[in-house]
Amino acid sequence: MDNNETPIETFHIGKAIKAELARQGRSITWLAHQIGCTRENLYKIMRREWIYTDVLFKICDALDHDFFKACSDWRKSPSYPKNANQTDNL
């Protein structure tokens, strides 16, 4: 991380999916068709910071991209909040 960068407090899976779609030049409609959901549902998924793992597996397969690794890499990075492992409300 560059010294001028602000740490990323959360890994937003929806934004990560949207960025990968753009990088590949694919559309929301294409991905929705690939994973068997409506475009509207996919927009809802991409607005969230969280996702069901079965849906993420489908998206990973469709885009040939490992979002699980991306999330894991973020968790190991300096951007990961130091107090994120606290589970006061569990």
What are the residue ranges of the model-derived segments?
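Short alpha-helical DNA-recognition segment
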Residues: 23-43
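A short, Lys/Arg-rich alpha-helix, primarily the initiator
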Residues: 1-26
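Short, basic-rich loop-to-helix N-cap that marks the start of a DNA-contacting helix
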Residues: 44, 48-61
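Short polybasic/polar patches that bind polyanions
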Residues: 15, 22, 33, 47, ...
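Short C-terminal boundary/hinge segments that cap the last helix of small helical domains
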Residues: 64-83
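Short intrinsically disordered terminal tails
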Residues: 1-2, 85-90
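Short Asp/Glu-rich motifs
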Residues: 40, 51, 79-80
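Key DNA-contacting residues within the recognition helix of helix-turn-helix
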Residues: 18, 43-44, 71
